[in-house]
Swiss-Prot record:
Ketosynthase family 3 (KS3) domain: residues covered: 2-416
Protein name in the entry: Granaticin polyketide putative beta-ketoacyl synthase 1
Entry EC number(s): 2.3.1.-
Enzyme class: transferase
Any Gene Ontology CC annotation: cytosol
SMART domains from the UniProt entry: PKS_KS
CDD domains reported in the protein's UniProt record: KAS_I_II (cd00834)
Biological-process GO terms, alphabetical: antibiotic biosynthetic process; fatty acid biosynthetic process
């Protein structure tokens, strides 16, 4: 019999919301946390706004040695891991460490630290300084994405399977999906899974400027992210992280754990079509949705809330709307759909995990977060996108989806354990 997998611990760092309470308060208030970039002089760029996080590593309990050793994204992942473990009440010291695994996602990993090291080594780009004295001894840690899950494993006391997932904006959803698959198959009893990204740096901002994917609405940062709105013109870049404790359902029950949700189904597909473009018909995302529902043994009408990718680009939101109609049929018009990127921006590889956190909290509190800044509906996005105001309703089952550059399309079904077939 396939083992059931549940989420028993959550840790979040998101713009405007560090910790599950602050994060959920932000979402349910429909409050935005996007602002002018403060990390560097962004005046030369087309898009000069972001979802930044006020994060003090020392105040978060990191030692000076850890601060030196860990990149900012890694610090986010470890901070969320500590929170998730504390939230779960799981005593990892009492477990066989070889049965504890880690799955971590990130789209750009330590790109910001690599950029900083380049500036040091090149005298801000003027001259290449080959003297190793100019190079940080932490350079290898920044260069190797595998260091991020290694640090999480260290924090969790995990000596089981450790996986790094980097497939763009679906990384955070896929890392949890792969963790669930491994736990079901018996390769681990507990997996700490999630994602972290800190892409607010000149090189990453410039990358998205070059393809005009980010919004130039710099005069109105708080209202710049407008998923599904007819006036949307790109996403707002953000940083963030979310980590979860996943464990086998019966083990969680035996120890009296608080269960946020069961991961009923997960699926991913690739369009194999274009690096940044999307097919208009949404076929591959629709296939992921149907496969995730099939794995969860749930009919499409069981979905109470769809946590959309909703990036705020013209093509994504129309593509996604088509996918929902294709996979959910008439139920697509009845179920509430919203995008939390409207409030905190798009944290690339981390956003899938952050959206899982929002999904399990929606189940926990029976509230659907709104889509902020949705004032002018797009005729091609004609579903119920929960504009402006959160909605109280029974939420037993959530479908959360992700779409990433490269054509990756992923879907996950989360539900109350008692709703399992």
């Amino acid at each position: 019999m396939t083992r059931r997998v549940v989420i028993t611990g959550v840790g979040v760092r998101a713009p405007g919301g560090s910790g599950t309470k602050e994060f959920w308060d932000l979402l349910t208030a429909g409050r935005t946390a996007t602002r002018p970039i403060s990390f560097f002089d962004a005046s030369p760029f087309r898009s000069r706004i972001a979802g930044e996080i006020d994060f003090d590593a020392v105040a978060e309990g990191f030692s000076p040695r850890e601060v030196r050793r860990m990149d900012r994204a890694t610090q986010f992942a470890v901070a969320c891991t500590r929170d998730a473990l504390a939230d779960s009440g799981l005593d990892t010291g009492a477990l066989d460490p070889s049965r504890i695994g880690v799955a971590l996602g990130s789209a750009v990993a330590s790109a910001t630290s690599l950029e900083n090291e380049y500036l040091v080594m090149s005298d801000s780009g003027r001259e290449w300084l080959v003297d190793p004295a100019h190079l940080s001894p932490m350079m290898f840690d920044y260069l190797s994405p595998g260091v991020m899950p290694a640090e999480v494993a260290w924090a969790a006391g995990a000596e089981g399977p450790v996986t790094m997932v980097s497939d763009g904006c679906t990384s955070g959803l896929d890392s949890v999906g792969y963790a669930v698959q491994g736990t079901r198959e018996g390769s681990a009893d507990v997996v700490v899974a999630g994602a972290a990204d800190t892409p607010v740096s000149p090189i990453v901002v410039a990358c998205f400027d070059a393809i005009k994917a980010t919004t130039p609405r710099n005069d109105d940062p708080a209202h710049a992210s407008r998923p599904f709105d007819g006036t949307r013109n790109g996403f707002v870049l953000a940083e963030g992280a979310a980590m979860f404790v996943l464990e086998e359902y019966e083990a969680a029950q035996r120890r009296g754990a608080h269960i946020y949700a069961e991961v009923g189904g997960y699926a991913t597909r690739s369009q194999a079509y274009h690096m940044t473009g999307l097919k208009k018909d949404g076929r591959e995302m629709a296939e992921s949705i149907r496969a995730a529902l099939d794995e969860a043994r749930l009919d499409r009408t069981a979905v109470d809330y769809v946590n959309a990718h909703g990036s705020g680009t013209k093509q994504n939101d129309r593509h996604e709307t088509a996918a929902f109609k294709r996979s959910l049929g008439e139920h697509a018009y009845a179920v509430p759909v919203s995008s939390i990127k409207s409030m905190g921006g798009h944290s690339l590889g981390a956003i899938g995990s952050i959206e899982i956190a929002a999904s399990v909290l929606a189940i926990e509190h029976n509230v659907v977060p709104p889509t902020a800044n949705l004032h002018t509906p797009d005729p091609e996005c004609d579903l119920d996108y929960v504009p402006l105001t959160a909605r109280e309703q029974r939420v037993d089952t959530v479908l959360t989806v992700g779409s990433g550059f490269g054509g990756f399309q992923s879907a996950m079904v989360l539900h109350r354990p008692e709703e399992a077939a």
